[in-house]
Amino acid sequence: MSSICFAGGNHARLPSKAAYYRAISDRELDREGRFPCGCLAQYTVQAPPPAKTQEKAVGRSADLQKGNVAPLKKQRCDVVVAVSGPPPLELVYPARVGQHRLDQPSKGPLAVPSAKQTSTAMEVVLSAEEAAITAPWLLRPCKGEAPPPPPLTQRQQFAALKKRLAVKGQQIIREHIRARKAAKYAAIAKAKKAAALAAVKAAQEAPRLAAQKAAISKILRDRDVAALPPPPPPSAARLAAEAELASKAESLRRLKAFKTFSRVRPALNTSFPPPPPPPPARSSELLAAFEAAMNRSQPVQGGFSLPTRKGVYVAPTVQGVVRAGLRAQKGFLNAVSTGIVAGARILKSKSQNWFRRSMGIAHDYVEGCMASTVLGCAGPVVQRQEACSVVAAPPIVEPVLWVPPLSEYANDFPKLTCSTFTEWQRPRKQSIAISNLFRKLIDRALLVSGVSLIASVLLFEIAENFAVRQAVCPVEMPSCATSVSEKSLVSLDEGNFYLRKYLSPPPYPFGRESFYFQARPRFIGPMPSMVRAVPQIVQQPTMTEELEFEVPSSWSSPLPLFANFKVNRGACFLQVLPQRVVLPDECMDLLSLFEDQLPEGPLPSFSWSSPLPLFANFKVNRGACFLQVLPQRVVLPDECMDLLSLFEDQLPEGPLPSFSWSSPLPLFASFKVNRGACFLQVLPARKVVSDEFMDVLPFLFSPLVSHQEEEPEMVPAVLEAADSVGDITEAFFDDLECESFYDSYSDEEEAEWAEVPRCKTMSELCASLTLAGDAEGLRKSHGVFLKRLVTYLQSFEEPLYSSRAFYSVKVKPVYRPKKFEGHIDCTCLDGNMGEWEWRESVDAMWRCPGRLLNTKRTFTRDDWERVQYLRIGFNEGRYRRNWRVLNLEEMDLSLHEYPEISSAPVQSSLFSRVVDRGATLASSIPFVTRSNCQSSLGTPGLNVHTIHQEAPTTLRAPPFTGARNVMGSSDAGANAAPYRSEARKRWLSRKQEDSQEDNIKRYADKHGISFEEARAVYKAPKEGVPTQRSILPDVRDAYSARSAGARVRSLFGGSPTTRAQRTEDFVLTSPSAGDASSFSFYFNPVSEQEMAEQERGGNTMLSLDAVEVVIDPVGMPGDDTDLTVMVLWCQNSDDQRALIGAMSTFVGNGLARAVFYPGLKLLYANCRVRDGRVLKVIVSSTNSTLTHGLPQAQVSIGTLRQHLGPGHDRTISGALYASQQQGFNIRATEQGGAVTFAPQGGHVEGIPSANVQMGAGEHLIQAGPMQWRLQRSQSSRFVVSGHSRTRGSSLFTGSVDRTQQGTGAFEDPGFLPPRNSSVQGGSWQEGTEAAYLGKVTCAKDAKGGTLLHTLDIIKECKSQNLLRYKEWQRQGFLHGKLRLRCFIPTNIFCGHSMMCSLDAFGRYDSNVLGASFPVKLASLLPTEVISLADGPVVTWTFDIGRLCGHGLYYSEGAYARPKIYFLVLSDNDVPAEADWQFTYQLLFEDHTFSNSFGAVPFITLPHIFNRLDIGYWRGPTEIDLTSTPAPNAYRLLFGLSTVISGNMSTLNANQALLRFFQGSNGTLHGRIKKIGTALTTCSLLLSLRHKDASLTLETAYQRPHYILADGQGAFSLPISTPHAATSFLEDMLRLEIFAIAGPFSPKDNKAKYQFMCYFDHIELVEGVPRTIAGEQQFNWCSFRNFKIDDWKFEWPARLPDILDDKSEVLLRQHPLSLLISSTGFFTGRAIFVFQWGLNTTAGNMKGSFSARLAFGKGVEEIEQTSTVQPLVGACEARIPVEFKTYTGYTTSGPPGSMEPYIYVRLTQAKLVDRLSVNVILQEGFSFYGPSVKHFKKEVGTPSATLGTNNPVGRPPENVDTGGPGGQYAAALQAAQQAGKNPFGRG
């Protein structure tokens, strides 16, 4: 027997036995037992039926059982199984009819392939054994055979089979449905992509098409205008009609889009015109955007609109935003419409009856105004349509369309507009027919307010009926053509008691049956809000009368008030909106409003920006609620303050007016406002005149749907909101236009308001209205009233009454922040005292004490900084201050100041030891402003500023003709010549022969002073010994022209100082007596930060005028232990020439001080040595007996220095001049009984000894003017040897006074130069020396990381082709330094800062990192931080040879192509007014031109390390404005990488070099740079600590620390850890930063204290740091898992990344790979070591390893080195490689053709377990061009450099991944992906 199943061509049957078994075991049929196709089965019986005694098959039909051949046409089944064997049976399993009929071909595991789906089914035949196993109950028992006992009944087994098959069928159906959905979504995505491409193409073509269209339109328009007469201008009515038609069409289109999904579907009127065709569907785009917004995890903003208001709710999800907005809208509309609609229904009939009785005419309302719409809502149409909850006002001509509920408006979520919700609703029918109307209305405040409002509306429309109509039949109104009618009072019935109570002039008794109502229209203003009990009657004057009193205003403004509601001070402005009459019973206290309206659940935080008149008797208007919330940032907790305590100091004087506030949500006592950004602005208060006393007037002309319309088309009702946002599906957005999804607005809010049609302004509305009337109805008072009405409307600002009034109005507040112009404004009534207070506070903050100058002098830049402002007393009263300002000419604005004395600077007595400073004279200096001060530029290039005065302040002698040159004169080379021993001997011999008196006379004659003065000077060193005071002047007066008087700032900003710049403890190295013991250290007198700041000021040289050495020994008086200190200039190899001075003393003499005057002049290059070796201090002792390890003395050294400009002229004070004269004879001063020695003589006598090298060790030496002699070179050394001398205790005459107060020797001036100091400009030729001039524009609100400008040095210099570039072009290569000079606007308050970064090797790639330049990347590159406070001129000098590694070629780059990036570091703390600009120059400084490549190595191995450079920035770091600021700590991980973005990280070359070392000890040097606003100040304390040690401010004072009193400056701290060292790769050390003063900021300034930290270097103590290994051998890569036996590989000998498709490559990361990747190029020699291991037992194994080195490829290949090794044996091979190309250097980038290549081959490679490639660096290996490492992402992810997946192998370390050779890897990988090996042969 066989069975055949048909299903409309799709056959459902089991193809084989195995399929049947799977169907039984896998449950591959559905729950109801259907095969997936739901087929119709037909059966054909091919064998006679069995005997009747056989058991019937379950599920068979009667026809089958009877043996009928006819098919079962109506039987639907899923499975038909034919079982062969005795007896043959078939199983028919019927399915349910009409369920899931699928027409598609069958799919799934049981589906038949399409090629096998034929018209005949496949027979499934089972043997008897199989049938017995599968379904034993189907077999009929045979004769003579015992039937097997069935474990279950047939029905039970059939049910089990059915259940198992149903589960699999259901799974198949689900897979089919899932496939349909996938196809559908794919089609949607494809359509979306096509639409996006079309939109992009349309956007690209739009400008061109628009230009063509505009041009064609202009041509046609000009031709038509020339040919035709000008058409008449359209009337206002026509314009209004056109606007109305456009608005109606838009409304119809919007409503039509959602009609199919409306919950309420009333019957449509088929007589309506057909709607416009639907726009193309863009459902997929909108659905995707909506789903993306719904799935956002952060809080989102949702907006909705109400009449003239907008709202923005912030909720965790979009669903919460929609629900909150719809709930508020529904409540608002219900509350408003309840009173208004009910009141309108009452007043409609009453007013019309009154019209008929009084005027005899019927009143027609103007369609489109508020009254007609409200009354239309309350008409019969509302009653007829209440069943469908639709409120509509029928138009006159067109029938009314159905209106969708609010849920459909919610579906149009992205397009909510103002006009969508400006309709009225009546939610339910309410009975208003009550017995006691007055009592009920009093109880219902909302109904009372609505009646009051509509009453005013109707009364005004009475007058409007006579006077104001739409322009239909314009008739000019005759002036005063009618008179007032006699019927001015009309009787009314008793039912209108409420109107009589409030609208009639006199109060009548309560029970009077009738009263009169005045016929003339009168409007009642806001009532007094203080009335509480019962409404009072206010007698209002007529329109022609003047108001004698002021009425309190009524305020309406957005205020969503919750418990944690915040107010934004920054955007508050006052806007008075027209408001209805506020009844007394509608006023309530602020804190008790709307408690019952608090929404359920947690309340979100809001931020509010709106006017807030906060006064003591502030009231809230319960009547009309308008909701609007502006989008605002998150309010921080420290920016909040209580509501009632806001602006307490800004309350006006006098009684406070009553206000009425309109708000929809509750107020509570915990109401908070935003303290941080609040700024109150109040409109000018003026008296309200009678013409303006009509708050209801603007409502009469305000349209309801944001446009004026003659006939209202519809007034849709707002029904219930959607239950959930999940109801919104894809079909909701099918009919929306494409333009709805593409716009150029910054946010959705702007896009919403851009679609709102603008309302007609008052002027436009008045222009469209004309006056019309008749002789009977027009009254004289009406004409007067209308004139005043037009005047009243035209006087308003038009933006106040448009649909965007809240956003477009520009409020003009009275209160403004003060703007200080830098001078006193005599017209200011308050004297502008705040300006002086402000400037004095700034001066105090920046340490700028005030100074006044004489107007008759000419001042330089230094004097300009010392200008003092006149301080006007603050306790003189307002009148006195105003009088002094207004009477400026009569003011006594003089200051008594002590100018320079006109005598000798110092007069001292030989016997009394009293120094007489001389008499002082007080001079009257008139008050001047800064504009009167002038600066003397001097000669071109002069950077020295000498003060010109009327008379010399210091008595100076006539020019001396003899040979003299004292420190302080303008001769730069006076002390440059070396001291010769012969000249010194002659000078000493003359000194010994002459008497002391002769020496004094000679000294006096030489310097032009008296004998007494010379004797006092000569004896000055001995007189200073008992007091132990320094003879040096105060450091603040050393370089000033004043020797006495006020304290002033020093020249050139940097204050010279002789404070103890460095103090060391002298610890003996030998404990035994008689052995010499010494101790030495190096000292740099000027820091890197000081030099950088002085370079910006144009200085280039340092003059070391005085060196002060102090020895404070450890011991008792009388101790004869000798101590000797010698100071050398260690940059001179000859000690005789390098000696600055030496001093010897005894421990028993106590404190010893010596001041030397070396006159040493150094360029900044001399001070920028890598190890800081400028001065060397040697301390020794010959007879010390102190225990070993304890300090013998404390030695301090300090300098008195001055920075010089190119002119080398300088000015010193008289005190310093006298000090130099005191030490002239012996060239040093002594104290404490010390013996000092210094090079003698101020002038070198004799003949310079010229020396010409002749070779062979012979020199030609000049012996006289014309005499020369030939001799061998000889050298001599100057040795200071100490010896013990008996110095008893008799010389000790008492206690030693060790005070240092007043000396100025070790005083720190305590202030840095102000950041806004002006800088003296150079000569006019300076601009011509620039190689490039550029300009940069910065946006006023630029954010951190914004890339402002990029300077390609070679390209841009080539483009401008200036004089310098032409010189560069002639020579070829540029070497040396470049200086970038920026002219920036000086501003210390904005807090704006920038970074200038040099990228020489293209490490920044916009395709990888985006358009913004990461600040972290700039912090690792060579970078200078620039703040606007550093202006106006900022310079940055960098060495091209060191940073680029080679000289720059003039036309294009070689290995380096340097670019300078200008980027924003920190945002503006104080907002800028407009965009700004600055210019810069690129200058060549200390440069040379040559034709040499001139490579300068960054590091050469091996290297002698005296210091370890770090060279990176960290920050920006902020300190909060609080009384207890938390300390900031930097983790000092010098060797680890920095994460730049995402999983991309990098490190610079200095950090890569530190990877070679484990760690070190020493001293950490760095500096702090302030980048924030000057309004925030702070003093910092820095200290190093171990990570496990807790450090507080108290404990930091007790350990090594550094205090930056000004919040910035250089620092140096010793590394202090338990092991006296720190690790470069472990988190071990912290730099803790404490705020010890501040942060302090004035009011309204919320900017935190911001700074950057630069880590410069570590000064080593023990020399070479601890390396990571003894032999610098590194494993470059490893090969494993070879896929073929004959394995070959080749790569260029340049240490690249290696990729191979025939094996697995494991790249290693180590210091060598990082250093190669972080530098530009390298050169040197190395040995490649190949090592391999086997994965099998060595026996008869064959195979070999061969490696060779060849130069070039292919035919031109040159064989060099080759080696062959068997696989079994040493398992190692070595090949020496030289990393060079034709340039002498190489990179890890793309290979070339002619360069060394390494060829490696393995036979029987599968036997090799691993092949390792090691590299051993040889001596002389050099790296060039320090930069940062290439960017790569993690292994297995898309590479940021390659654009494809990285090779598997190089592991990440902590935060770093990737390896060297990114460019080579890119080229190699691209070639291998294309199917070829670029380095293979053939």
Curated annotation (Swiss-Prot):
Database matches in Pfam families: Nepo_coat, Nepo_coat_C, Nepo_coat_N
Query: What SUPFAM superfamilies is this protein classified in?
Result: Positive stranded ssRNA viruses (SSF88633)
Keywords carried by this UniProt record = Capsid protein, Host cell junction, Repeat, Transport, Viral movement protein, Virion
Q: How is it modified after translation?
A: Specific enzymatic cleavages in vivo by the P1 encoded 3C-like protease yield mature proteins.
Please, which domain of life does this record's source organism belong to?
Answer: Viruses
Map the sequence repeats onto residue numbers.
Answer: 554-606, 607-659, 660-698
Q: Name one GO cellular component term.
A: host cell plasmodesma
Record-level Gene Ontology MF annotations: structural molecule activity
> Where is the stretch described as Disordered?
1289-1320, 1838-1863
Q: Where in the cell is it found?
A: Host cell junction, Host plasmodesma
Give the Polar residues compositional bias ranges. 1289-1303, 1838-1847
* InterPro entries (alphabetical): Nepo_coat, Nepo_coat_C, Nepo_coat_N, Viral_coat
Q: GO biological process annotations for this chain's record?
A: transport of virus in host, cell to cell
Region named 2.5 X tandem repeats, Pro-rich: 554-698
Q: What role does it play?
A: Protein 2A: implicated in RNA2 replication. Could also be required for nematode transmission of the virus.
More details: Virions are comprised of 60 copies of the coat protein.
Q: Which family does it belong to?
A: Belongs to the nepoviruses RNA2 polyprotein family.
Task: State the protein's name.
Answer: RNA2 polyprotein
